[in-house]
Amino acid sequence: MTTSIENTQTTVTTSTAKTVITHNGLFHADETFGTAFLSLLLGSEVRVVRTRNPQVIEEACVALDVGGEYDNAKLRYDHHQREFTDVHEGTSVKLAACGLIWRHFGTCLITKLHPELDIEQVKTLWQSVDETICRPVDLQDNGQGTFKVEGAEAQALTVSMMVAAFNQQDIYSPAQDEAFMRVVEILKEYILNFLRSEANKLQLLKEAEEAVKAQLGSRVLVLDKFLPYREAVLKANAEEGGQFDLVTYPAQGQWNIQTIPVDDTPENFYSQRVSLPQRLWGLTGPDASKESLGGSALVFCHKTGFLAAVKADTAEAARKAAEAVIAEAQAKA
């Protein structure tokens, strides 16, 4: 099997890119993550060599965090040279090996692992990995991750510190190389799970956007499963003439009815366009079951009135329950 690394400047296949070089000795999060990214992209055919030998580095196809050269056309990704000043776009965070590899190969890795994503979703996921993983790792590697607490130097617990803990007493021993590859395997698993989770989230966001568009004229958004609807609903209400007041979705054999904030400003994060009837707030168990909304028995209502559950058999019954909430609010307005 031949796996391709592709970017705007060069294409390399595993038939010629079997060897990835990084430095030996003490290892850090930036080159372990970078090696993990490349290993996931190239697959089982990749061969990782840890060395500082200039001749070996010169003959390698891909070299990261070693060699004193950054040249994407030559697949050289070091950041230690004095003239290197590249930063993560829009920030002052200097790039290290993790960010450099992700900059050039992240999109290719995402499309390989998640071909179901469209171009915009790939861009969003790339940005998420860059912000969540690469920037903090590079920040730490370049010495920008230290902050002061009550006048003393302190560091947050970071993935960089986790990686550093694997270093052996003799950093040039075979055990050090074995430890490095253990970290790479751990990071590969983390990267796979992070990408899977974020890709799934993007798909759910897309489903939510489609549901909102399809029901734009309604005051009740009815979902056939829970979706991360908040962003899509607030955008529709603010920019697309939407008038959504409530959302309802199935949950564990019942239907939840949830309020929608006035807008997406921080001060209105917990606001409610329409609140559930105050007479229901905090009800649970037998007390709740004595009440109903639109013909569906109440299961519970949160004490702040932002969420309730009803025993509705169908989506239409849940809609009627939500519409009853709106009608009661209008009657008291």
Where are each of the predicted segments found?
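Short helix-capping/linker segments at secondary-structure and domain boundaries
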Residues: 41-45, 106-115, 168-172
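A basic- and aromatic-enriched beta-loop-alpha substructure that forms the phosphate/nucleotide-
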Residues: 64-151
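C-terminal accessory domains and tails appended to enzymatic cores
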Residues: 29, 59-60, 75, 84-91, ...
